[in-house]
Amino acid sequence: MATVDATTTAGSGKQTDAAPSPPAAAAAACRSLSGADLALRVLLFAVTLSGLVVLATAEQTVRVPVPQIPGLVLSLPAKFKDSPALIYLLVALCVTCFYSLLSTAFTSLKLLFGSSPSRTLFLLVLFDVFYAAIMASATGSAGGVAWIGLKGNSHTNWNKICNIYGKFCRHIGSSVFLGLIASVVLVLLTILNAHSLYRRSR
């Protein structure tokens, strides 16, 4: 009987070593989610900073001859400051970039010192949703301006300008694209942290 008990004890010990305990598995899953959260926030910072720099440098001056007056050439500048929608996108990129920096630091501390309280995680979800809405609205507004600059609008007699201001339009288009990526990243962060809250509530 002693031999059987010893064998059973040894077998159960092997099973314990082979399968991790539920708390250990939960901690590993939590760290995995936190790592994904940190990677997305670093990506968000890089994207918003790049979009901010690209949009802030969106400026071009072209020399356009006046057909009615031979020899007269006008210097016509194009700046992002000329459009309220582009200014809105710049502000949205700026505040989202600052938020991504703060949230990246917070997530790094969470990885170092353990999981954060559910209340803090819930606030993080709310902020992610808030900034996702800001970025989506700003990107949509700027995208409308960029489309008119690219294609024009014959119904309102708005002429396209991208055939003249090529560099300026490339900057605007790139910043709108980066703003769209930032919006998608924020949505992914919202889903990820909402899933973390769901795991804790089970």
Curated annotation (Swiss-Prot):
Residues 59-85, 141-171 are extracellular. Residues 1-37, 107-119, 193-202 are cytoplasmic. InterPro entries: CASP/CASPL, CASP_dom, CASPL. The chain crosses the membrane at residues 38-58, 86-106, 120-140, 172-192. GO terms for cellular component: plasma membrane. The keyword Membrane applies. Residues 1-15 have a biased composition (Polar residues). Homodimer and heterodimers. PANTHER family: CASP-LIKE PROTEIN 1U1 (PTHR36488:SF8). This is CASP-like protein 1D1.
